[in-house]
Amino acid sequence: PAYNHLMIGDEEISAEGQAIKRYTSDGNFTGDVIGRGIFENQPEGIALWQTGEKTGYWIFTDQGIDLNQYLFFDRQSLEYVGAIKGTITSNTDGIWLDPVSSLRFPKGALYAIHDDGNATAFSLAEIADALGLNLP
């Protein structure tokens, strides 16, 4: 990728809180820790929403047994830009981002596993509107 980022969820519970650790694509830890103090539960699913050659958003699942939230960070600055929650989806281990336009999802969709058995789809257009994200 453009910034040589490899994101790994750190599920270890510590006084500092759980977070995402950034590595280079060859496996070297950069020292950057993302989302500490923002995650309420375990960091799980990770997806990159690429909106341009060097723009977009990292999406991280904050996995809760009762309800998840999906945290969005700017691809370039790695700054937190907001979160969304589904009304049902919980206990998500994995997410998948499909940026391809369809009739139902004109800007694509974010798919999340619900409780190890079903999938939920979130409209990327609705997410962008809710969080005030810039899309091409």
What are these language model-derived features?
Residues 91-136:
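Blade-level signature of beta-propeller repeat domains, shared across WD40, Kelch, NHL, RCC1
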Residues 27-29, 77-78, 126-128:
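Short coil turn/linker residues within repeat-based beta-strand modules
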Residues 30-36, 80-87, 131-136:
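Beta-propeller fold detector
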Residues 1-4, 46-54, 96-108:
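Structural signature of eukaryotic scaffold interfaces centered on beta-propeller domains
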Residues 37-47, 87-97, 136:
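Repeat-based blade/solenoid architectures
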Residues 8-9, 36-81:
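Loop/turn-rich, solvent-exposed surfaces of beta-rich toroidal or solenoidal domains
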Residues 15-22, 66-72, 117-131:
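Structural motif
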Residues 2, 16, 42, 66, ...:
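Beta-rich catalytic cores
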